[in-house]
């Protein structure tokens, strides 16, 4: 099975971590309901406090719909002034079964 993997890294401005977290939690809650979403996680680095979204999508079309969704647009707008920057990697992937 092939799918799309997204790794989006967000560096919060100093003091903004507590403001970004509830915004991200709301985004995750709504995104997990989307058609075409396989998985969507919000993580925080124990090393430097950077946030990361790790996402799996059935298709590029599903990812595109997500990026146009009201909850994604709201998160993007509300978090823009709270972040130093954001880096995104989008990969085509295929599941590998290591135990066959």
Model-based region annotation:
Residues 2, 43-47, 77-100:
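Glycine-rich beta-strand-turn "strand-cap" elements at beta-sheet edges
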Residues 4-11, 41-67:
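Short, well-ordered beta-strand segments in beta-rich or mixed alpha/beta enzyme
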Residues 8, 70-73, 96-100:
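Short flexible/disordered coil segments
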Residues 11-17:
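Short, surface-exposed ligand-recognition loops at beta-strand->loop->(often short) alpha-helix junctions
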Residues 26, 30-38, 56-90:
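An amphipathic, aromatic/His-enriched active-site/gating alpha helix that lines ligand/cofactor pockets
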């Amino acid at each position: 099975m092939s799918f799309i993997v997204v790794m989006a890294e967000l560096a919060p401005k100093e003091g903004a971590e507590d403001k970004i977290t509830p915004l991200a939690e709301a985004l995750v809650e709504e995104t997990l309901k989307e058609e075409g979403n396989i998985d969507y996680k919000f993580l925080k680095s124990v090393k430097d406090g950077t946030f990361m979204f790790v996402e799996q999508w059935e298709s590029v079309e599903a990812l595109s719909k997500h990026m146009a969704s009201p909850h994604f647009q709201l998160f993007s707008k509300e978090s823009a002034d709270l972040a130093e920057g954001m880096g995104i990697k989008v990969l085509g992937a295929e599941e590998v079964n290591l135990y066959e």
